[in-house]
């Protein structure tokens, strides 16, 4: 396959003319969410939700579980990266005027509120 044929093949993809690097953040959201689900699952396996043993189970994950400290750090950093990608994704929508499409914008707003409520509940009530 020649270089010119490869460039022609990529130019025929159905992509708008105003595509930019801002559009990558939607797929990065999926990657961050996948990492959050996987690390959260493995952390939940070793976590004890008892109020008297919660701190001990965190120490157990950090010290005794193989690569537990990596899972904890990946989960914490992944959550921050997830929210950064969300805010950049929303900023792209505002910049390109996607808020004019009311149905899509309202469904995205509903997803954002649900996401923030879930993240808040998981941070506040994980010890009860």
Curated annotation (Swiss-Prot):
Binding residue positions for heme b b562: 75
GO biological process: mitochondrial electron transport, ubiquinol to cytochrome c
Swiss-Prot/TrEMBL cofactor(s): heme b
GO MF annotation, one: metal ion binding
Disulfide bond positions: none
Binding-site residues, heme b b566: 89
Pfam families in alphabetical order: Cytochrome_B
Keyword RNA-binding: no
Subcellular location: Mitochondrion inner membrane
Family matches, as Gene3D superfamilies: Cytochrome Bc1 Complex, Chain C (1.20.810.10)
Coiled coil: none
Record-linked InterPro entries: Cyt_b/b6_N (IPR005797), Cytb/b6-like_sf (IPR027387), Di-haem_cyt_TM (IPR016174)
Keywords of this entry: Electron transport, Heme, Iron, Membrane, Metal-binding, Mitochondrion, Mitochondrion inner membrane, Respiratory chain, Transmembrane, Transmembrane helix, Transport, Ubiquinone
Top-level lineage group: Eukaryota
Membrane topology: Multi-pass membrane protein
Positions that bind a ubiquinone: 126
GO cellular component labels: mitochondrial inner membrane
Cofactor note: Binds 2 heme b groups non-covalently.
Bilayer-spanning residue ranges: 25-45, 69-90, 105-125
Record note on quaternary structure: The cytochrome bc1 complex contains 3 respiratory subunits (MT-CYB, CYC1 and UQCRFS1), 2 core proteins (UQCRC1 and UQCRC2) and probably 6 low-molecular weight proteins.
Biological role stated in the UniProt entry: Component of the ubiquinol-cytochrome c reductase complex (complex III or cytochrome b-c1 complex) that is part of the mitochondrial respiratory chain. The b-c1 complex mediates electron transfer from ubiquinol to cytochrome c. Contributes to the generation of a proton gradient across the mitochondrial membrane that is then used for ATP synthesis.
Entry's family note: Belongs to the cytochrome b family.
Additional free-text comment from the UniProt record: Heme 1 (or BL or b562) is low-potential and absorbs at about 562 nm, and heme 2 (or BH or b566) is high-potential and absorbs at about 566 nm.
Protein name: Cytochrome b
The organism of origin for this protein: Crotalus viridis viridis
Gene (UniProt): MT-CYB
């Amino acid at each position: 396959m020649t270089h010119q044929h490869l460039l022609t093949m990529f130019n025929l993809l159905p992509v708008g003319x105003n595509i930019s690097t801002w559009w990558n953040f939607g797929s990065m959201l999926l990657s961050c969410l996948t990492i959050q689900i996987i690390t959260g699952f493995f952390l939940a396996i070793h976590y004890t939700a008892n109020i008297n043993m919660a701190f001990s189970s965190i120490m157990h994950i950090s010290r005794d579980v193989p690569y537990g400290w990596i899972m904890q750090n990946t989960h914490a950093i992944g959550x921050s990266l997830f929210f950064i990608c969300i805010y950049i994704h929303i900023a792209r929508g505002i910049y390109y005027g996607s808020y004019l499409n009311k149905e899509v914008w309202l469904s995205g707003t509903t997803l954002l509120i649900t996401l923030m409520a879930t993240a808040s509940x998981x941070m506040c009530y994980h010890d009860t």
